[in-house]
UniProtKB/Swiss-Prot annotation:
One of its GO terms (molecular function) is zinc ion binding. Residues 1-20 are annotated as: Disordered. It comes from Chlorobaculum tepidum (strain ATCC 49652 / DSM 12025 / NBRC 103806 / TLS) (Chlorobium tepidum). SUPFAM superfamilies: Tetrahydrobiopterin biosynthesis enzymes-like. This is GTP cyclohydrolase 1.
Length: 224
């Protein structure tokens, strides 16, 4: 009679961990356990409760009973980029390739929050690089944009961080990033200019030194 092999819980747990890590190799990977940290979520929930009282609301009324926890969970999601490593994400999909012309991913949706008022800003990012023996999986470029956007930001720094991450990992002949965004801190408050759009750029290598390369990039994103 054939005996069935039994697998210890430890082995099963190790296999589960390996499977999870393998999935992280394919997708964005971050410390999920940190998201489930009840102590952090609890302190954030208490803080939102105090804010509601501070603006003159009653956190105990029916419509607001679950609001503190909902807001805390939303903020954890909107700032998940702090718990992700964009350069490690890029390194998981780097390939040797002789292609040496511009690679452009444009019209990447971005949603972030300004660090001054914690109000949203949103728009489009356009990212290009010129390979020097290495390319990266195309989906990783929007993912890197997402990682940096899901933090408290200023648009200027966000633009530079995207450029620097790609430059550091691929060491290409050049990187170009342009972001066009609407800032709710300018729309809902302050100057209240509903149609104002902020454009920032960060470039390196050939995009800095070659006018024709820079012009090609701007033409391709429709900004010339």
């Amino acid at each position: 009679m054939k005996q069935e092999k039994t697998v210890s819980p430890t082995v099963e747990n190790n296999r589960s961990a390996e499977s999870r890590l393998s999935q992280c190799d394919l997708d964005e990977c971050f410390d999920e356990s940190h998201d489930r940290d009840e102590e952090v979520l609890g302190s954030m929930t208490d803080a939102v409760y105090s804010l509601l009282k501070g603006v003159g609301e009653d956190p105990e009324r029916e419509g607001l009973l679950l609001t503190p926890e909902r807001v805390a969970k939303s903020l954890r999601f909107l700032t998940k980029g702090y718990r992700q490593d964009p350069e490690q994400l890029l390194k998981k999909a780097v390939f040797t390739e002789s292609y040496d012309e511009m690679v452009l991913v444009k019209d990447i949706d971005i949603y972030s929050m300004c660090e001054h008022h914690m109000l949203p800003f949103f728009g489009k990012a356009h990212v290009a690089y010129i390979p020097d023996g290495k390319i990266v999986g195309l989906s990783k470029i929007p993912r890197v944009v997402e990682v940096f956007a899901r933090r408290l930001q200023v648009q200027e720094r966000l633009t530079q961080q995207i450029r620097d991450a790609i430059q550091n990992v691929l060491n290409p002949r050049g990187v170009a990033v342009v972001i066009e965004a609407t800032h709710m801190c300018m729309v809902m408050r302050g100057v209240e200019k509903q149609n104002a759009v902020t454009t920032t750029s960060a470039m390196s290598g050939d995009f800095m030194t070659s006018q024709s390369t820079r012009s090609e990039f701007l033409r391709l994103i429709g900004n010339h």
